[in-house]
């Protein structure tokens, strides 16, 4: 196969749509006449992608919703499997959505279709039993982080570390002034801004919002120039947080609709729920305290399943506790406030942290889409040579 004529891609959510669009653009540079189809989002559609189903039909969360939607999801997967077994694409690329994609990838690869999976499932952290399926499913695993690549090397699973697109798009240096102006925040020089990001889900906000506000209240008590900014992830979270804020009328809080990027950019320090937003905060070079709290039984169950030393991406990438992780019983307002105060009171600590964030940023900045596209081309060329 000297050129790509037809590529199948399946993504399940907005983050995958961003990766898929970047990958499509990079492959189109090499193969302008290549056709792309499968399941994609608006960014991929804008590049001419033929989506056989709406991407939102795969976007399910939690444990209950996937069970309710199981017949529909299985039907979509069966339809795709039949389509690509009958008329095989030059390569199948599953982007994230491992619970949907991996079984499909196994079936297609067994039939001789070259398979790539883009974004490693978190097998390094939990559900390691999936490794056997991954080994059967992929000709190439594209990873966003170097520790994932090291893990797959140990498992003898072919992989390529491509870096993270956010590291490509976020500048190495980011100043606060422009973000504060865009958000309409006070421009007084002596004010210190703390961003609170208690999560995007109702349960996360329920467990973390009040803790974060109590922590901010304690920090504010000794620092009257402190100001609080909270970007609500959506309208539902905005309403939920507004109710909590009624009990904290003495705190100088600005509640936003979305705008989390600018909120983090405007901040001197961040209290943040564990999750992918911690990566963005790190790339913006903002000191942070990572926290998480959930129902006691859920935490007990998760602690039995999770095998990684850390939960926060900055710490996973550094392979050490670069920033505080205060989880469950340690996520008390007093401990959160004390950890936050270190950043507010020590310019030296903050500067040392920023230098380490910068080193990680450079490590992740690899032109992800171009690197991924070339990795796919090289894998297909190697398979072609073996087949000769």
Swiss-Prot record:
It comes from Saccharophagus degradans (strain 2-40 / ATCC 43961 / DSM 17024). It holds the Pfam family LpxB. Condensation of UDP-2,3-diacylglucosamine and 2,3-diacylglucosamine-1-phosphate to form lipid A disaccharide, a precursor of lipid A, a phosphorylated glycolipid that anchors the lipopolysaccharide to the outer membrane of the cell. This is Lipid-A-disaccharide synthase. It is an enzyme of class 2 (transferase). GO terms for biological process: lipid A biosynthetic process. One of its GO terms (molecular function) is lipid-A-disaccharide synthase activity. Its EC number is 2.4.1.182. Pathway: Bacterial outer membrane biogenesis; LPS lipid A biosynthesis. It comes from the Bacteria.
């Amino acid at each position: 196969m000297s050129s790509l004529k037809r590529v199948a891609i399946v993504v399940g959510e907005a983050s995958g749509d961003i990766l898929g669009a970047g990958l499509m653009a990079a492959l189109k540079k090499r193969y302008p006449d290549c056709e792309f189809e499968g399941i994609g989002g608006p960014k991929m559609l804008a590049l001419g992608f033929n989506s056989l189903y709406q991407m939102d039909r795969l976007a399910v969360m939690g444990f209950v919703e996937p069970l309710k939607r199981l017949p529909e999801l299985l039907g979509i997967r069966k339809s795709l499997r039949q389509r690509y077994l009958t008329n095989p694409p030059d390569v199948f690329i599953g982007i994230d959505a491992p619970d949907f994609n991996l079984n499909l990838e196994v079936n297609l690869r067994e039939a001789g279709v070259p398979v790539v999976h883009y974004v490693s499932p978190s097998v390094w952290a939990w559900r390691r039993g999936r490794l056997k399926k991954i080994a059967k499913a992929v000709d190439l695993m594209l990873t966003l982080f170097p520790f994932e690549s090291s893990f797959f090397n140990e498992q003898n699973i072919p992989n390529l570390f491509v870096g993270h697109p956010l590291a490509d798009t976020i500048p190495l240096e980011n100043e606060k002034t422009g973000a504060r102006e865009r958000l309409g925040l006070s421009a007084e020089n002596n004010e210190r801004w703390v961003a609170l990001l208690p999560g995007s889900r109702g349960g996360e906000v329920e467990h973390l919002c009040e803790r974060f506000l109590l922590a901010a209240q304690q920090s504010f008590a000794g620092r009257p120039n402190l100001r609080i900014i909270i970007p609500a992830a959506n309208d539902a979270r905005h309403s939920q947080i507004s109710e909590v804020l009624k009990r904290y009328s003495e705190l100088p809080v600005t509640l936003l609709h979305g705008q989390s990027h600018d909120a983090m950019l405007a901040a001197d320090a961040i209290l943040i729920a564990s999750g992918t937003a911690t990566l963005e905060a790190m790339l913006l070079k903002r000191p942070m305290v990572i926290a998480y709290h959930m129902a006691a039984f859920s935490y007990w169950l998760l602690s039995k399943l999770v095998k990684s030393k850390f939960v926060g991406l900055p710490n996973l990438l550094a392979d050490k506790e670069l920033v505080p992780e205060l989880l469950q019983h340690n996520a008390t307002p007093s401990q959160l406030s004390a950890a936050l105060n270190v950043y507010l009171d020590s310019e030296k600590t903050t500067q040392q942290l920023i230098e380490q964030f910068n080193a990680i940023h450079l490590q992740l900045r690899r032109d992800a889409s171009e690197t991924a596209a070339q990795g796919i081309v090289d894998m297909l060329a190697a398979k072609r040579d073996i087949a000769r």
